[in-house]
Structures are given as structure tokens and as C-alpha cells.
Amino acid sequence: MNGDLNSWDKFCNYLWFDNKLNIWLDISKISFTRKEIDNLEEKFIDVFSSINELENGAISNIDENRQVGHYWLRNPSISPSSKIEEEICADINEISEFGKQILNGDIKNKNNQKYTDVLWIGIGGSGLGPILITDSLQKSSRGLNFSYIDNVDPFLISERLEELSEKLSTTLFVVVSKSGGTPEPRIAMEIIKSHCENNSLEWNSNAIAITMKDSKLFKKATSENWLKIFNLQDWVGGRTSITSSVGLLPLALINENIFEFIRGASLMDEATRTVDFKNNPAALLSSAWYLTGDGIGKRDMVVLPYRDRLQVFSKYLQQLVMESLGKKFNRKGEVVNQGISVFGNKGSTDQHAYVQQLRDGIDNFFCIFIELLDSPSTSIFDKKENPKEYLSGFLQGTRSALSSENRQSITITLEKLNCFSLGALIALFERAVSFYAELVNINAYDQPGVEAGKKAAANIIEYQQKVRNLLDEGGEYSINDITSLFDNSVSEPIFFILREMCFGNDNYLVKGDWSNPNSLVIQKINS
């Protein structure tokens, strides 16, 4: 066996299929030899052991001293205690029942009206997961209409309020924050809450929190008597929260089967517990990533789902893969700068965009094609020109064109897209990420870079208030004047703060030239 990307024997030897899941995985167009894959197979003895310990409740997130329990969510019986098992089962049943009550009209607003919409407020995995759920699975005119605030962009918040202006009284406001202290959802929540109160609209009786017990958000929702509080466990990270209440509540509110979603994820987990390397799809997938990137992430991952409903999947994988694997240090404390960059959109659109570079430009990537075999049961398509067949042809053609230039790829094929298969697909990548992290000996479950960014942002927000207070006192100030009062190392941030404050704001008089920061003098003229 050699690294030939077009070997039929290699294709047959490394094609994985499961007839319970109806999912295929083909890694044959990754360049590797039998010796390389055999050597890697030996490493998986320790990988499988580590994942088994994780699932049994070991403190796998050493840096944060936490268990990692998202795999328990789809099979509560494997959780390390009966208390956790009972809690998970109760949460799932509570969400399912709540969804039915909302959709049936058993739970209505203060005016005895059925709810029509959901405004979902969440950042990172608390936004991306639900967006993936609704984009992939929601059928037209089924369930509640979903809108999202997954950023503190003032235009986004304003647009959402305008879009829902006539329906705010029948809108559920879902706020997701594990700790309750994340600034973005808190700021958006306060703006929406204030808008409702200023317009004599209900907030408390329409509001739902998804958070940890006894968090700041939990206490707020409890004291204000919000409509509902759903549990988000301490041992569930944001990027792996889609099989928790974060993903299950959207499923319930669009009238999809949350139990099928969980079952799909659970069956994929089960398939990836086998220690038979060549029959373990997550082992094969993570091995392909490892081999194509020489174990140090040399190649970017380009995700190309050939179905519009999975367009968000590449964004979802960006967080799952990059936040999990993008680490400066390994578990020994050695600098390794690990990571795999992820981007993508959808096929066949991308064939008319950057696939040109993928085939003929710099060879620094591998593709993951995602194929669906199903088609709508409709008579509107001409049998001679069925778009499904064209789409399949475009995928195979692109795959072939890339391999003809020795450009590497992986293909994942699903029989159909539904709750079950989406749950399985997500679980496959979650497991592959866990396996890859074990291969390269990094902690996949912390995010020190994200925390550093949060701290830096908090410092800037503190300076914003200091600058505002200083200008409120009166007088003219240059950037040097301001930095000399605070910290001479923050001249650039002070410039950005002043620019953001002054443009489009008549309360400030600016003298000087914005292209020459040292010439600027700012004074507040209106209160």
C-alpha cells in the first residue's frame, strides 16, 4: 500500500460504513502508506484508554480541574454517578415536555396568546449550535420562528428588534450563559429587556435562561420569576454543548425529535468506542488529520458540504476544531503551537470560488466533502436533469480534479439529513477532535487564548469608562495627555477608544487630523 490517492485497493481497505448509522467515511484520498497507518494504530492503544478514562469521569480538563461529560448527555447510563444520570434524563424529558406545551399552546403569554417566535441570545457554541440546528433541520412553517443575537453588533440588535417589533409580545427570549457573566449575552439581554419594559411589553414571563445552577443568570432569572430555567452542567463546554439543553431546546421548539438527535449521537459514540482501529470512524478521521498535517497541523481543513442546509456546519467546526486544538502548550508544558485551521462554505458554490486555488495553487490544505444521498419526494424535477444527480456529479468531479493534482481529501456520505444523522455527524467530529488531541498530547477542553482575549477586552472596557469620565469633567485632552494619566503603554487603544466615541457623535469637538494621532485634541461640548 502506498500513498496513491487513486488506488482502488486503498479505497476498499479504508472505506468505513455502518448500517445502523448509514454513514460512510472514505480517507483513501489522504496520502499515507500502510507503514504510517500501522505505526499510528499502535498509538491508539493509549488514545482509546484515555478516552475511556474521560468517559468514566476522570478530571480530563486538568487546567480547569473539570470533568468532561458531553458524551454522558447522549447515554446517561455511562455517567459516573446515578445522580448525574437522573439529572440528565430529567433535563431531557423536561425540555421535550416544555416544547410540546409551547407548540400546543398549553403555555401562553400573559395575553393568552400562543408564542410565535424565539429570540435566541448566545455567543460562541451557545449561538453556533442552535443556528446549526435550525438551519439544518427546521422545515418551513413548522415550530416557532428563530432569530439570533450572537454578537453585540448594535445594528444586529436593532435589526432584530425591528424585525420582531409586531411580535415581541409572543416572542420567547432565550438567554444562554453558563456562568451568567459573559459580557456579550448579558449586554444584549439588558438591551432587549430594557426595550420591552420601555414599551410596556413583557420580559420576565417571556424569558428563558439556560445556565448553571446558582450562576449569576440563574439567580437573576429566579428573582425576576422568568418563564423557565434550563440546566447547563459545569462539565459541558460551550463548543460541545449541542446535545445539552443548548441544542435540545431549539429542536423541541421547531418540533423536531430530540430523542432521535440524541440517539444518532449516541450510536456514533458507540461506534467510536471500538478498539478495532480500522472499524473506528473517529480513529480513522483523526488519523487522516494527523497524517496529512504531519501531526503538527501543517494543512488547513476545508469543509465542503454539498447541501445548503449544512452551510453553517463549517462555521460550527471552526469553533469545535480550532478552539479545541489550537493550543500553545502540550500537557508537558512544552511549546507546540498546535492547531488546524478550518474554513469552508458549500458545494457547488465553492467550485466557482476558491477551488481554483485548491487545485492549482499552494498545497496547504485537505478537503472534507460531505455528501447527502437523499432528495425531496417531489415531481417538480425532470428525470433527465435531476439537480441531485448534478450535485453529486459536481462533488465527484471536484474530488477527482483535486486528486489528479495530488490534493488530499476525505469524503463523508450520509444517507439523508435529519435529526438522527445530524446528531451522528456532530458526534463523529467531536470524537475525532478528542482523539486527535490525545495523539498530540494537548488539552482539548480548555481555552486559555479565549480567556486571555476576555481579560484584554475587559481592560479596554475599563479604559473606555475612564476616558469617558475624564472628558465629562471638561477640558481639552490630547492622546498623550490621557495616556500620561493612565498608562503610557496604551496610546494605541486610547486612539481607538476616542475614534469610536467621537465619530457620529456631536457631543465631542475634535481638533487635529485623524491621520496624525499626535495632533488630535478632544473636548466634550454637550452633555
Swiss-Prot record:
Single Gene Ontology BP annotation: glycolytic process
Positions annotated as active site in the UniProt record: 323 (proton donor), 352, 454
Gene Ontology cellular-component terms listed: cytosol
Highest rank taxon of the organism: Bacteria
Family, per entry: Belongs to the GPI family.
Protein name as it appears in the record: Glucose-6-phosphate isomerase
Documented EC number(s): 5.3.1.9
Pathway of action: Carbohydrate biosynthesis; gluconeogenesis; Carbohydrate degradation; glycolysis; D-glyceraldehyde 3-phosphate and glycerone phosphate from D-glucose: step 2/4
Pfam families: PGI
Subcellular location: Cytoplasm
Reactions accelerated catalytically: alpha-D-glucose 6-phosphate = beta-D-fructose 6-phosphate
SUPFAM superfamilies: SIS domain
Species of origin: Prochlorococcus marinus (strain MIT 9215)
Function text: Catalyzes the reversible isomerization of glucose-6-phosphate to fructose-6-phosphate.
Keywords from the named record: Cytoplasm, Gluconeogenesis, Glycolysis, Isomerase
EC class (word): isomerase
GO molecular function (one): monosaccharide binding
NCBIfam families documented for this protein: PRK14096.1
InterPro entries to which the protein is assigned, alphabetical: G6P_Isomerase (IPR001672), Phosphoglucose_isomerase_CS (IPR018189), SIS_dom_sf (IPR046348), SIS_PGI_1 (IPR035476), SIS_PGI_2 (IPR035482)
Stretches that traverse the bilayer: none
